[in-house]
Design a protein with these regions (language model features):
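Hydrophobic anchor at the start of a short beta-strand
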Residues: 19, 46, 154
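Hydrophobic helical membrane-anchoring modules
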Residues: 106-108, 132-204
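Acidic donor-binding segment of Leloir-type glycosyltransferases
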Residues: 1-22
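Active-site acidic Asp-centered loop
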Residues: 1, 49-51
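Aromatic/hydrophobic pocket-lining residues that form π-stacking "cages" and hydrophobic walls in ligand
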Residues: 10-12, 63, 143
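A short, conserved beta-strand element in the Rossmann-like catalytic core
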Residues: 4-5, 54-56
Length: 204
């Protein structure tokens, strides 16, 4: 978002690190911030990472290799052999596993960490899963579920995750948050079963 600490501290870095800092034209919200970036990114693929350091840049190499191997999407799992998770709050961990199990059973895609924001996509995927509807953290499930339902291939690798050491997480657990996630999950589920393939990559 425009007012977050990462957004403010990113301003002096472009000349030193080659980082391009953009200001979102939308109101605050995780989903809006990511969508603003997806509208202007350059290149053949894009990776989405948290700005608080919880995701490891080293795992980007594994994502890149998946895309090089021909997959349309590169997904990471924090809960498979080889993955490492540090200081995940227990109540959030329990809820995470329950939600991801439900999504896995509902969509039958065999992926156990759909809610993880850290993923990479080819440009063609981002272009063909529009329009994106999520304003908030529910974008973390809209992106991968639409990609899978619309027929794009994906590879999964173990990744590491470390709880932030400073600052306050913007994500909070509430009935409002749950309803937003449920809306997106049901929206994509209904697309899968009622659209008769109108949005599938083979039907576009």
């Amino acid at each position: 978002s425009n007012t977050s600490r990462p957004a403010r501290t990113a301003k002096p870095k472009p000349l030193r690190y080659g980082v391009r800092c953009i200001r979102s034209p939308y109101r605050n919200g995780f989903g809006f911030a990511v969508r603003a970036g997806l509208e202007v990114f350059e290149g053949d693929a894009v990776a989405i990472m948290m700005a608080d350091g919880s995701d490891s840049p080293t795992d980007l190499v594994a994502y890149f290799r998946l895309l090089q191997a021909g997959y349309d999407c590169a997904f990471g799992s924090r809960f498979m052999p080889g993955a490492k998770v540090y200081d995940y709050p227990r109540y959030k961990l329990v809820l995470n596993r329950v939600v991801n199990l439900g999504i896995r059973l509902l969509f039958g895609h065999g992926y156990n960490d759909t809610t993880n924001a850290f993923k990479a996509y080819r440009r063609v995927v981002i272009e063909n899963i529009q329009p994106l509807l999520s304003h908030h953290f529910n974008l973390t499930v809209e992106l991968p579920l639409k990609s899978v339902v619309r027929g794009y291939s994906y590879g999964i690798v173990p990744v590491s995750w470390t709880n932030r050491e400073a600052g306050v997480a913007k994500f909070s657990l509430s009935n409002e948050t749950g309803s937003r996630y449920l809306f997106i999950i049901l929206y994509v589920f209904l697309e899968r079963h009622l659209s008769r393939g109108d949005y599938h990559r083979d039907g576009q």
